Amino acid sequence: MILSQLLEYDNIYIQPHDNPDPDALASAFGLYVYFTSYEGKNVKIVYSGRSKIQKSNLVLMIEECEIPIEYVEKDTDFGDALLITVDCQHGEGNVSNLTASKIAIIDHHQGTGVGDYREVAPYLGSCSTLIWSLMMKEGFFIDDNTKLGTAFYYGLMTDTGNFMEVSHPLDRDMIDSVKYSKSLVKYFTNSNISLPE
């Protein structure tokens, strides 16, 4: 699957898994940046689940990177639209059952989720790397977007234990390529230690 295949849809909802982590947020944000660069697209990042985002590092990441995510009720039906699940697979246990007329799955975990479009790369350390790679294949470079670069970097960092589990060249390429804020990454990381949850 390539991202430009999904440009036929004007109403696009991007859903990370319930209780999203930094990689899920960064992945959703990357798709949001890509699709909103095209005129006439109504794009929203939505999530559901038992609770709203509360962890300090995630709240700070959303604020500092300006990730426009909103909570919706379980079983929301978006009607004639495309729903893209990121860092998870539609129909599996870690993601609420939101619906739309078409479903796309973009993930770096093996799974059995069913969708009309599917891109799964279990060899990568993060879904952020997969989204970054899909954007690069479209010639969509994010060199000047430090907020997205920071989100991607932090997403991979947290999903790979501070890069200890990075083994694929694409993960390394993303680390070397994106422009990110070292101070923000440190701020997010330290917030888990210093701020009460």
Language model regions located:
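Residue-level recognition of the N-termini of beta-strands and the immediately preceding loop/turn
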Residues: 41-44, 81, 149
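Active-site cofactor/cluster-binding pocket
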Residues: 60-117
